[in-house]
Amino acid sequence: MGYLFTSESVSEGHPDKVADQISDAVLDKLLAFDPSSKVACETLVTTGQVVLAGEVKTKAYVDLQRIAREVINRIGYTKSEYMFEGNSCGVFSAIHEQSADINRGVEREDPMNQGAGDQGMMFGYATNETENYMPLSLDLAHKLLMVLAEIRREGKVMTYLRPDAKSQVTIEYDDNGKPVRIDTIVVSTQHDEFVTPADSSKEAQLKADEEMLAKIRQDVIEILMPRVIAGIHNEEVLALFNDRIVYHVNPTGKFVIGGPHGDTGLTGRKIIVDTYGGKGAHGGGAFSGKDPSKVDRSAAYAARHIAKNMVAAGVADEMLVQVSYAIGVARPINIYVNTYGRSNVKLSDGEIAKKIDELFDLRPKAIEERLKLRNPIYEETASYGHMGREPKVVTKTYESMYHEAKTLEVELFTWEKLDYVDKIKEAFGL
């Protein structure tokens, strides 16, 4: 019997994602001026306020207020009626120095033997049901909101859009785990109050709300969806769109109050959106605001890199990779593989795990170097998912009143590169 599977995404203007982006913007600026920075930056955003807290060890000085305001303005919180606006919100910092005990436990004379920054288990997942080796439900949920943000920034249609939004996509699968069709799409988007009631009566207000909701629903189906579909070039995925899709658009009705004014946002509260949308597994550690000595982040990226390259090489159609660490110890405690019975090689999952251990150095410093993680590459990861993104080289310029400006060429989403496929094929005789 087939089944339904659902994943959700949230926009860059969702309060938790605002917090993630501020935390990663702080991390990026510190890494730009001091690549050896140790950073754990947490952010809280609420009505008219930003609170930064955490632990940092660095030689760099950065303007935290300016960083936070630039991120908020870039996202689109630029109007006072949002009750959270980049130029006027308060920014409070309680960031202090990293624990000397943790630092002693992690650093080593030989950098390659640098210990893990904490204990824990991290997971990487990949499936061949999409071209970027991501679960289809999450991939589509991200695409919906990325296109919605493009429409908002263009300002030509759907001009009532505000930054906060969520999406959810449900896919029907057959008995063999293959996508059959898209079952349900949910889009909730914050908006201006763009229909004025005829008078102050409750009935007039209700009628105005119904007009707004009808317009938003129409625009999602007639403007947003065609643009999303036009950006999909995989014929198998395009065939899943059908006239039976159930659309829920702003199902609670009016959504004017939103963003950090509607809900307080915190760093690290969207870890399933950040990863695989509920497929695979998650070790529980968030990513944003953490430098790569924190294996919560770096080892999760490494595990994704492994899983994606293994699936792309044809070892399996689907793969989950787990690694775990003890704080202060460089080598992982274990490597675990689950191919869900979809392996294409005559090896057990345990034997596949042993080959992974031979192919990939999973010491934290080796991961940092292989994936070029000591660079300011993180703000881009903090919205629309850390996984399944397109690797690319960009040039960034960082200015500071405390340091000379720095222009750096950096590579984004290195863990998404298919640079180990040939080595894996050779190792597995494929």
From Swiss-Prot:
Q: Which superkingdom?
A: Bacteria
Looking up InterPro entries in the UniProt record yields: ADOMET_SYNTHASE_CS, S-AdoMet_synt_C, S-AdoMet_synt_central, S-AdoMet_synt_N, S-AdoMet_synthetase, S-AdoMet_synthetase_sfam
Q: According to its UniProt record, where is this protein located?
A: Cytoplasm
Binding sites annotated in the UniProt record for L-methionine: 55, 98, 263, 294
Q: How does it assemble?
A: Homotetramer; dimer of dimers.
| GO BP, sorted A to Z | one-carbon metabolic process; S-adenosylmethionine biosynthetic process
What this protein is reported to do is described as: Catalyzes the formation of S-adenosylmethionine (AdoMet) from methionine and ATP. The overall synthetic reaction is composed of two sequential steps, AdoMet formation and the subsequent tripolyphosphate hydrolysis which occurs prior to release of AdoMet from the enzyme.
> Which gene is transcribed and translated to give this protein?
metK
So what does this thing catalyse?
L-methionine + ATP + H2O = S-adenosyl-L-methionine + phosphate + diphosphate
Entry protein name: S-adenosylmethionine synthase
Enzyme class label: transferase
Gene Ontology terms: cellular component: cytoplasm
Location of the region described as Flexible loop in the Swiss-Prot/TrEMBL record: 98-108
